Swiss-Prot record:
PROSITE patterns the UniProt entry points to: TROPOMYOSIN
Entry-annotated residues carrying N-acetylmethionine: 1
Region span, Disordered: 1-42
Lineage start: Eukaryota, Metazoa, Ecdysozoa, Arthropoda, Crustacea
Species name: Pandalus borealis
Protein name per the record: Tropomyosin
Amino acid sequence: MDAIKKKMQAMKLEKDNAMDRADTLEQQNKEANNRAEKSEEEVFGLQKKLQQLENDLDSVQEALLKANQHLEEKDKALSNAEGEVAALNRRIQLLEEDLERSEERLNTATTKLAEASQAADESERMRKVLENRSLSDEERMDALENQLKEARFLAEEADRKYDEVARKLAMVEADLERAEERAETGESKIVELEEELRVVGNNLKSLEVSEEKANQREEAYKEQIKTLTNKLKAAEARAEFAERSVQKLQKEVDRLEDELVNEKEKYKSITDELDQTFSELSGY
């Protein structure tokens, strides 16, 4: 009888231990399930972050493509502007050459006019000297008359030459006036061309600044792409680690569930054995 009681006490103790282990295993199972759920939530969050990073990367790449296209357009505009500047420089050079030739013709006409004026002054002086002389000697008078005739002839010739020179001078003055008008027109064109050059220069400076900003934006996009790529790699690594953790936790849950089933079977076996023992005792 004592042996039976001891056996019953041992079986009861084993039953209590089995129930405690079962409760412990159930608690561990709940904790493992909670950890698994948290890991799944973390994996879901990481997947969302990964998707967001991929979307950000696509946006940055699209922005970089647009920036490169804009930069190519600026390069084309810069090339066209340089061509326009070269054409303007050629036009300015031709105008400067035309102006230089006009100035040479003006200097030549001025020199000829001075020479003609000097010759006319000399003839007039000689004529006045001959007219003012009073000679009593006939030979001298004849000579003077001959000289006067010659002087008059020279004066007439001088007048004729003066008229011719005056006519040529008028032509020269007309040419000079036209040259001055052309020079003024050339100066106006030069001013306009200088203004165009200034505008083109400002445009070139603006293009250079835009190109520099585009380069800076390109570097910033590259740096941002590099950062996003690193974040993407880190997120992928974390996702892989989380997936491995979930797999490990799932294995642990499966193991605990198997152990719980075994403990329940042991508990059922002990309970059946106790019931059988009680039945046997009742038979006595």
